[in-house]
Amino acid sequence: MRNHYIQKKFLELFVGDSGIYVYDLKNRRPLSMMKNASNIAFQKNLYQFYSNPVTDLEIERWIKQIEDPGIELISKIIETETLPNMEGLQKLYVYFLLQSMRTPCECQTQLELAEKINAYDGRYDYRDGVVSRFFDDKFYAAELFELCNYYDVYLLKMDKPLFFVTDCFCASLTVPTKDKIIPLCGHLALYLVQKGNKNKKIDLTQKDKVQLITESDYLKLVCDFSCTVDRWVFACYNDIVKKFIPKWYDIMFGREGHE
């Protein structure tokens, strides 16, 4: 199944195999999430969404609903089949940015964040049960996950590297000066995280332990990985995508029929 998202009035909806997530783009924080979206009822409804046209009025009404977010509300939307049609919005994008499911940042400094990360022993299982499935023994899921979870703490303080790997699931590569995010596939992300973090504990005060890559390094990795990736993910920030990865642009936007 493809993953889709819509964006309207600073709100973003992510619909995928793992769940439904609502993200507040203006305040950069998640609003709500519903796990286990791969159940029979959801699958049945999802196919109906593709074929039923949705008017702007219906979209506006739905957006107003999720401004008061909650898991119960998202569940109700699924049950009543009021989720808007993705194609009807002409916003059919493959999207796998899991920031939507994360909790707001509680750390105020890099040091506090490092201490919070180092407090885990690597066996911590996130409350939604999604971390452990993505890692084997050589990865410390909780540390990496929390590092991604609180990226706002240090991302805005970084001005030198063009790209910074912050997401161990889908490689959210960011251009700090423009505050843009480019999500890529999970396999590439794991490769970058593994390469950049050799030690068990991650200390954000020691930036040499966190993988930083230049534009040319990034493009080379993209080329090397392009033949092995089994799930495509791409950014909605067209200007960044077109500038740095033009070859991927058509593929990632589905123009070559890649599933």
Predicted regions: what is each one?
Residues 1-2, 6-259:
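Alpha-helical structural context detector biased toward long hydrophobic helices
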